[in-house]
Swiss-Prot record:
Alphabetical list of SUPFAM superfamilies matching this protein: Snake toxin-like
Disulfide bonds: 3-22, 17-39, 41-52, 53-58
Naturally occurring in which organism (per UniProt): Dendroaspis polylepis polylepis
Annotated stretches, region: Important for binding to L-type calcium channels: 41-48
Top-level taxon in the UniProt lineage: Eukaryota
Gene Ontology molecular-function annotations: calcium channel regulator activity; toxin activity
Function text: Specific blocker of the voltage-dependent L-type calcium channel (Cav1/CACNA1). Inhibits cardiac contractions.
Lineage: Eukaryota, Metazoa, Chordata, Craniata, Vertebrata
Tissue specificity statement from the Swiss-Prot or TrEMBL entry: Expressed by the venom gland.
GO cellular component, one term: extracellular region
Subcellular location(s) per record: Secreted
Name of the protein described by the UniProt record: Toxin FS-2
Amino acid sequence: RICYSHKASLPRATKTCVENTCYKMFIRTHRQYISERGCGCPTAMWPYQTECCKGDRCNK
């Protein structure tokens, strides 16, 4: 799986992952502000929410 792996303020980067999912994490009240992206599907703590997907570069 190829996932985007950059933090919000950094240039776009990708990473080849062994996990079968990618994620993007954002603040629940501001879905347009994505704080980070990466491999897997971690559990988020309030006020963050994780959105996971299966597909190359699906966490845009």
